[in-house]
Amino acid sequence: MDYQAVRKKYTLYTRGAGILTMVLILCVTFAVSDIPMRTGGVLVIVAGLALAIYLINKWYLSTVAKLLHIDLDFTSWKQYIETNKEAKRAILRLDAATSEVSLSYMTGDFETAIRKAKEILSRDGLQVQYRNFLQSYLIRSVVLSQPELSREELNEMMGELTITDPTLAEKTQKMSVALYDLTIAHETNDYFETLTNEYKYPQLEIIYYKALNAAIKGDTNRAHELLRQLAGEDERLYVVRMGKELYK
């Protein structure tokens, strides 16, 4: 089941709940003559609708999150972006735009990730959580796409970050330094060694950079053991392609 199928079910469930509510209210209105009982019945039905909508929304959000982040379903990613980038609600259009940054980063299209992130960051009144998210993706995309980047330039970029979430700010700085060490300076960095993540792409990312760290240390056996975990994964993903090159 992809995103479009989930969205169709969501629409069906919400409309069905609304229609059923209207039918029940009409039934109560015509069947119950006692006004207090009729009012109570209508309130119960409305409360039931509110609960149903809450449960439907919870199911929808968890299912979409699983498709995008746990299953890493490319079809769903593209459908999600295409469907929501022209949505009536501004928040959905913004979410689609930031999702495009994420997808570009995961597939190694760092130029697009950088361009899109800068475009969104230039908007007035951008919510803090999106600004934080985009700054994190932007600096990592720069590191991975500019092999000539100097450490001084990296430090300058990190000094310009305005991420307000302390945890994300620390993670972004440490990860950016680790990426620089491993991919540009070709120096060891153990940052990824203790990391875990419930989402699939970060899991694959951790595996690849642990393997790269092992290779730089000269531990070829461990590097190959880690890289075998990437075998069979979608080669549209940047770290999978890079892992294949490293395994040669």
Model-inferred region functions:
Residues 1-78:
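N-terminal alpha-helical membrane-insertion module
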